[in-house]
């Protein structure tokens, strides 16, 4: 029963991650074809940074469910958000320091996926009752 309470949230997070991943692949392929492969690679890295960090947050956020686990739920959300920020910083550091990436597509794709993360949940609202 308790696991069933978190199932809708997990499903929503999974759908959102799939939309984000698809958008990253689509934009990276488009930039690779339209501009050059370096831009496509950089776009893939930029969007991938966001998707990986968001996936870690989703795993932490929906680890617990139920009224008895309220403190653990709050702690897992906080832990997930901290990990998301740390992973984002670490992956951007690795991208800047150790990879030959173009900054414009890297940041544009990151911001695109961030926008999807903000706007896409509206698509999942179901007002039919």
UniProtKB/Swiss-Prot annotation:
Chief place of localization: membrane
Membrane topology: Multi-pass membrane protein
Parts of the chain that traverse the membrane: 16-36, 44-64, 77-97, 105-125
Cellular compartment(s): Cell inner membrane
Name of the protein: ATP synthase protein I
NCBIfam families found in the cross-reference section: PRK05760.1
Keywords: Cell inner membrane, Cell membrane, CF(0), Hydrogen ion transport, Ion transport, Membrane, Transmembrane, Transmembrane helix, Transport
Family listed: Belongs to the bacterial AtpI family.
Coiled coil: none
Superkingdom as given in the UniProt entry: Bacteria
Presence of the UniProt keyword Transmembrane helix in the record: yes
InterPro entries: ATP_synth_I (IPR005598)
Matching Pfam families: ATP-synt_I
Functional summary from the UniProt entry: A possible function for this protein is to guide the assembly of the membrane sector of the ATPase enzyme complex.
GO biological process: proton transmembrane transport
GO terms under cellular component: plasma membrane; proton-transporting ATP synthase complex
């Amino acid at each position: 029963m308790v696991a069933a309470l978190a199932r809708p949230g997990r499903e929503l997070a999974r759908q959102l991650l799939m939309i984000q991943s698809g958008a990253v692949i689509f934009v990276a392929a488009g930039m690779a074809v339209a501009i050059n492969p370096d831009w496509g690679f950089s776009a893939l890295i930029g969007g991938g940074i966001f998707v990986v960090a968001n996936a870690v947050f989703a795993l932490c956020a929906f680890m617990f469910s139920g009224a008895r686990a309220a403190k653990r739920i709050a702690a897992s959300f906080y832990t997930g958000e901290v990990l998301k920020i740390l992973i984002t910083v670490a992956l951007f550091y690795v991208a800047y320091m150790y990879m030959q990436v173009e900054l414009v597509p890297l940041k544009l794709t990151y911001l695109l996926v961030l926008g999807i993360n903000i706007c896409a949940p509206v698509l999942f609202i179901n007002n039919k009752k």
